[in-house]
Each structure stands twice: as C-alpha cells, then as structure tokens.
From Swiss-Prot:
Protein name: Proteasome subunit beta
Active site per database record: T60
The entry's keywords: Autocatalytic cleavage, Cytoplasm, Hydrolase, Protease, Proteasome, Threonine protease, Zymogen
GO biological process: modification-dependent protein catabolic process; proteasomal protein catabolic process
Classification of source organism: Bacteria, Bacillati, Actinomycetota, Actinomycetes, Pseudonocardiales
Gene responsible for this protein: prcB
Annotated propeptide span(s): 1-59
Pfam family, one: Proteasome
C-alpha cells in the first residue's frame, strides 16, 4: 500500500525556510508586503486636499530617564480622537527584548503594529544569528521602521517611538542605560541629558523631569519621578491621562537593569506609587503646577 507523507500538500515555500536574511521585515517585504504597517496607510481612503478620511486614536505622553545602574520608560494610558477620549487604558510601553523597551506616541493603531513587528524583528535576528543585536543596532532597526512610515506621517498618521535600553557592553555599568528618540523621517537622537519625553504632554513632563531628575537616584526613586512627571503632564495637557483612582488605571512602567533585564512593573506597585503621589499633591495644593 502506498504511503502518503504526513505533511504532503502542506510544504512551506522555500523562502520560508531560507536563512539568507536575518531580518523578518525584509522577509515580509518579499513574501507578504500587505502585512507591513505601511500597507494600512497605502490602503486608507483619501479625502480632498490630502490626509485621511478619518481621525484615528492617538497615544499621548511617554517619559524616560536613566538612574544609577539602569534606565526606565513610563507612559500614561489615554488615547484621544480630537477632543474625545478614545481609550482610558491603552498600553503604550512594551518590553521588546531582554534589555530594551519602547514607548509609543502618535497614531495608536499603526504604532502598536510597529512595536509588535519590531519585537518580532529583534527575536528573529537573535534566532537566526545566535546573538542579539547591539544597542545601536536595535536603535537603527527602529529608526528604519519609523522611516518606512514616512508616507503615513505626511498623511497625518505619524508614529513616534521612544527607545530605551541597557548597554551590556558599556564600560561603566552604572551609566549603561540609554535613551534614543526619533523624528518622523527616521532620524535617531541620543538623549544624553538622562531624561526625555514625547507626545502631547512632553513639554510639561520634561519641565517636571528637569526639576526632579537625579542621575544618582536608585530605581525606586526614578520610578516615582517618572510618575510625578506624567502627573504634571496630565495636569496641563488634556490628552494625557493621570492616575485614575476610581477605575484603578495607572501608568505603565518598565525598568531595565543588568541584573533583572527589562521588567514591566506590576500594577500593584505602580498603583501604590501613583496613589502616594496623588495623596502628597492633595496635601500641598499650592504646588500642583
């Protein structure tokens, strides 16, 4: 009796088994370009005078700062459509590999696709090459992805990530945390001040960080400083959501250190800090901003 192989008729195309490139994005460009974030932009209906036919939700404020032995990134949870709150609990900060994380501002849907694809890109590279990308390599990968959305940015669908990472090859482990920002053309910028913010509330968050930032602070102090900066941003920017004690919605925070790598803080921990900040501010209303 003739034996039929179990996988007969289900063989993957040769391209799926190729190791010619360690880039998952290059693979998608060749085999399934419709799955790239830019495809969504290209397929959106146009309106007279340019732009898109609707206003999608936008993510708002992300802050980052270095501390003694690491770096952190934090974001509020609000997304807006015009002057309307589109979401109160959007996650905008993501761990992307063992020693890096990304926060997203801008067009929410495209930004979420971009950061998920970026996470797969880093994992794919490590599986093919057997080593992870250097920190500069990770930042350059993300810059190229942002550049790939330039048409979307010109159509009003911009995405701006904020990248943080711990450089395991740094000479000084205490100063190994790094922050990299980007513009819509894919330009990447090292933020050597030790802190940065992006999004609609960035100017208020950076003003707060400028007063509170301490490069010698430990991780706990740095987390509180970041949450205070988001609180200050929400106090003046309607598109930034502050701690919501009623709904129990609090900022998202990721810390990165040599010992623990990239770790998303449990909500219970951020809730405790956020509630402490709100309580302290309510006790000294003259200093609310």
């Amino acid at each position: 009796m003739e034996h039929t192989p179990r996988n007969a008729g289900f063989a993957l195309p040769a391209a799926y088994m190729s190791t010619m490139t360690s880039s998952f994005i290059d693979f998608l460009k060749a085999e399934a370009p419709d799955l790239l974030p830019r495809a969504r932009v290209e397929n959106m209906p146009a309106v007279p005078g340019g732009g898109s036919a609707f206003e999608p939700p936008h993510g708002t404020t992300i802050v980052a700062s270095t501390f003694n032995g690491g770096v952190l990134i934090a974001g509020d949870r609000r997304a807006t459509t015009g002057n309307t709150i589109a979401s109160r609990d959007l996650e905008k900060v993501y761990v992307t590999d063992a020693y890096s994380a990304v926060g997203i501002a801008g067009t929410a849907g495209i930004a979420l696709e971009l950061v998920r694809l970026y996470t797969v890109e880093l994992a794919h590279y490590e599986k093919i090459e057997g080593v992870s990308l250097s920190l500069d390599g990770k930042a350059n990968k993300l810059a190229n992805m942002v550049k790939g959305n330039l048409d979307g940015a010109l159509a009003g669908l911009a995405v701006l990530p904020l990248f943080v990472g711990y450089d395991i090859d740094a000479d000084d482990p205490k100063r190994a945390g790094r922050i990299v920002s980007f513009d819509v053309t894919g330009g990447r910028y090292e933020e050597n001040a030790g802190y940065h913010a992006i999004g609609s509330g960035a100017v208020y968050a950076k003003s707060s960080l400028k007063k509170l930032y301490d490069p010698e602070a430990d991780a706990d102090t740095a987390v509180r400083t970041a949450i205070e900066a988001l609180y200050d941003a929400a106090d003046d920017d309607t598109a930034t959501g502050g701690p919501d004690l009623v709904r129990r919605i609090y900022p998202t925070v990721v810390t990165i250190t040599a010992e623990h790598g990239a770790v998303m803080l449990p909500q219970e921990e951020t809730a405790s800090i956020a509630e402490s900040v709100v309580r302290e501010r309510s006790e000294r209303p003259g200093q609310l901003g």
